[in-house]
């Protein structure tokens, strides 16, 4: 039998009973305090749909950007410091939004990636994670090609293990100045 780490001897129990003598048990009040929620602004469904269309407009299946085939999947826009890639690789950025493409068709994946980019810009999210998975390697091959075509993508790199490893990409999105 294990001895309780915080067991009290009889003297301590008696002292406690004396100190709480004459107190009454409080009944639970019925007031429930709900956590304060961040005020979310209403976004018209038409605007969201237009943002998705605008963002997926850039994704062509015919265009083949010149991506480095050696090593992990990575890309940095020409006007961006290559140090951003190193920070992505090391996991210095934590993604705030995640997109899981498992089970989607190429067309659905393009729409969802477009929606993710639009949501990141709207919510001022600089780093996001796209999980394309392994599967038949179709989305794994196509996702970087689509992302490299989009003007709002600053850089992307194969995600560190904690964010999905070689089955995911961390992306940096260009944001409008607030």
UniProtKB/Swiss-Prot annotation:
Name of the top EC class for this enzyme: hydrolase
UniProt keyword annotation of RNA-binding present: yes
UniProt xrefs under InterPro entries: Smr_dom, Smr_dom_sf, SmrB-like
A GO term, aspect molecular function: rRNA binding
Residue ranges annotated for the Smr domain, each copy included: 99-174
PROSITE patterns: SMR
This enzyme's EC code(s): 3.1.-.-
Pfam families the UniProt entry points to: Smr (PF01713)
GO biological process: rescue of stalled ribosome
Keywords tagged on the record: Endonuclease, Hydrolase, Nuclease, RNA-binding, rRNA-binding
Family (UniProt): Belongs to the SmrB family.
Function: Acts as a ribosome collision sensor. Detects stalled/collided disomes (pairs of ribosomes where the leading ribosome is stalled and a second ribosome has collided with it) and endonucleolytically cleaves mRNA at the 5' boundary of the stalled ribosome. Stalled/collided disomes form a new interface (primarily via the 30S subunits) that binds SmrB. Cleaved mRNA becomes available for tmRNA ligation, leading to ribosomal subunit dissociation and rescue of stalled ribosomes.
Subunit structure and binding partners: Associates with collided ribosomes, but not with correctly translating polysomes.
Protein name: Ribosome rescue factor SmrB
Annotated source species: Photorhabdus laumondii subsp. laumondii (strain DSM 15139 / CIP 105565 / TT01)
Species classification: Bacteria, Pseudomonadati, Pseudomonadota, Gammaproteobacteria, Enterobacterales
